[in-house]
């Protein structure tokens, strides 16, 4: 049983490995085998930086932390450092189905297809951004094709490309700490639940946040698009991409 007295910042359960992995202060990593296990064992992480988040994908555990720390392990027991190409604190890491994405302070975003080589996405793409991330990331989520960032001050932002970020105002005074997509709710069995300070808890159903628009067509060509309701995805006045399917006979 662990006698660790420090802080854990993240913990995950990986069913295919039947393993718990917890990460925390000063490079602390503890693992346990079995979903009901109460015996956690310390592992050498190869870093003294605080570890803030851990994810499992591509048959690997990957953890990130302060000072740009990135470490990886295929079993949770033996960890090796990776080069993140940043010195900013990394506060969260996700896998969006195609690549690892880590986010942190000063709008830092890093991407990797294999967890070994990390591309400093935010710095490299900055010149192409109309609304770059200028906030400190606390968390990053990927839900229904949308990247959702939560800042360290509890504000909500969204992006389709990790380059341009827009603020999403919510009608709640307390800061948001985290959110999760669930498989229940009135709209196609989906509901996003957010939690935050002061026992904050609220939810959104995708149908409420769906953008609607009216297109003008001349001689079979779309000449303009008017946003009627920006929903979650667009600000009124922005120019969203339009995909037109061929006519069906």
Kindly label every feature range from the protein language model.
Residues 1-207:
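Residue-level hotspots at or immediately adjacent to binding/recognition sites across diverse folds
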Residues 207-249:
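Conserved, function-critical positions that sit in or immediately flank catalytic
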